[in-house]
Amino acid sequence: MTTQGITVLGIDPGSRTTGWGIVREVSGVLTLVDCGAVRPRGDEFSDRLGAIYHGLHEVIARHMPDEASVENVFTAKNAASALKLGQARGAAVAACAAHHLPVASYAPTEIKKTIVGVGRAEKEQVSFMVARLLGVKGDWGPDTGDALAAAICHLNMRRLRRLAAG
């Protein structure tokens, strides 16, 4: 960590929409750097995975974060959905790896509990708290809100690990 603090890219993977958000922490103060979503077009699944990879690759090259935090895949409506979600997550992690970015993974319930205090919080509650923590108006979509939550969760967990280490 430099005197400029640490910058974390949070990612909420999805085959239709992959949210991303970049949060910087300096002396315990969180600042929103940028956020958005990669929305692949087309029916060919491999093309969508490529779009996720390239979209995040561009975000990382533009903002040069120090670390990344990616929401883990635990549940889906069915096995096929879980597989697609896992592949989208793989494309996101590969984009981070191409930039030698350390990647942390957190379960959705862990992220929600860190941000809202409840592991089963609704997406709207998460977005509301993310906006409050960042001191901004939260006019992003749910995927971007979840990505920002993943970044904040990682910053909080990092701080706790440093405190525990003494």
From Swiss-Prot:
Residue positions binding Mg(2+) 1: D12, D143
Domain of life of the source: Bacteria
Enzyme class: hydrolase
Record keywords: Cytoplasm, DNA damage, DNA recombination, DNA repair, DNA-binding, Endonuclease, Hydrolase, Magnesium, Metal-binding, Nuclease
Coiled coil: none
UniProt-annotated location(s): Cytoplasm
Gene Ontology biological process: DNA recombination; DNA repair
Cofactor: Mg(2+)
Keyword DNA damage set for record: yes
EC number: 3.1.21.10
Catalysed reaction equations from the record: Endonucleolytic cleavage at a junction such as a reciprocal single-stranded crossover between two homologous DNA duplexes (Holliday junction)
Main location: cytoplasm
Xref: InterPro entries: RNaseH-like_sf (IPR012337), RNaseH_sf (IPR036397), X-over_junc_endoDNase_RuvC (IPR002176)
Binding site for Mg(2+) 2: E71
UniProt cofactor note: Binds 2 Mg(2+) ion per subunit.
Any matching Pfam family: RuvC
Family: Belongs to the RuvC family.
Function as written in the Swiss-Prot or TrEMBL entry: The RuvA-RuvB-RuvC complex processes Holliday junction (HJ) DNA during genetic recombination and DNA repair. Endonuclease that resolves HJ intermediates. Cleaves cruciform DNA by making single-stranded nicks across the HJ at symmetrical positions within the homologous arms, yielding a 5'-phosphate and a 3'-hydroxyl group; requires a central core of homology in the junction. The consensus cleavage sequence is 5'-(A/T)TT(C/G)-3'. Cleavage occurs on the 3'-side of the TT dinucleotide at the point of strand exchange.
Subunit structure: Homodimer which binds Holliday junction (HJ) DNA. The HJ becomes 2-fold symmetrical on binding to RuvC with unstacked arms; it has a different conformation from HJ DNA in complex with RuvA. In the full resolvosome a probable DNA-RuvA(4)-RuvB(12)-RuvC(2) complex forms which resolves the HJ.
HAMAP family: RuvC (MF_00034)
Listed name of the protein: Crossover junction endodeoxyribonuclease RuvC
